[in-house]
Design a protein with these regions (language model features):
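Conserved catalytic or regulatory cores that recognize and/or transform ribose-phosphate-containing ligands
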Residues: 1-170
Length: 170
């Protein structure tokens, strides 16, 4: 069973989301499409087997992370997501179209933990060979960890297909 952590920016502004509309607003988020159920990606759990590939367990990130007393929401999110990366085998990083400073940080953390990392980029936005906002961290991560793959895609559906077809890490 491959334990997968997904990292990427939500495409709905956080200030628009509340407990009454969270499931509706995030139902089209790529996490929901990968897992096959919006609720399983919103509320923190120990992991859920994805609908279209019984060989993959989604272990994070979640919209609502577990909250520890004494920590701010932001401190808690960082703490919980680093724990999720610690227990995963694979980090899927979505660097298409949206600025994702947290994703860059999670990729770097995963690289130091020697995790398998697959970074998906839009060729029109990011060219790590020449220009684009992500070239430096992508090259750095590739130099730190031999288990990093960069895949240029035209559509986020390709990320879903990749996860649905995962059999083993290599």
């Amino acid at each position: 069973m491959i334990k997968m952590f997904y990292s990427g920016t939500y495409k709905v502004r956080h200030e628009l989301i509340n407990k009454d509309n969270v499931l509706e607003l995030l139902k089209d988020d790529i996490r929901s499409k990968i897992v096959g159920n919006v609720k399983d990606t919103v509320y923190s759990s120990d992991g859920v087997i994805i609908k279209n590939n019984k060989n993959v367990m989604y272990v994070g990130g979640f919209y609502y992370e577990k909250q520890e007393i004494g920590k701010s929401i932001c401190e808690n999110v960082v703490s919980e997501e680093l724990k999720q990366i610690d227990k995963c085998d694979l980090v899927i990083a979505n660097l298409t179209k949206y600025s994702a400073i947290a994703t860059i940080t999670e990729i770097m953390y995963a690289a130091f933990k020697n995790k398998y990392i697959v970074i998906f980029c839009d060729p029109n936005v990011t060219s790590y060979n020449v220009e684009g906002e992500y070239w430096f961290p992508i090259i750095t991560v590739k130099q730190l960890n031999k288990n990093v793959k960069v895949i240029f895609i035209e559509d986020e559906k390709e990320i879903i297909e990749y996860v649905n077809n995962l059999k083993e890490l290599k």
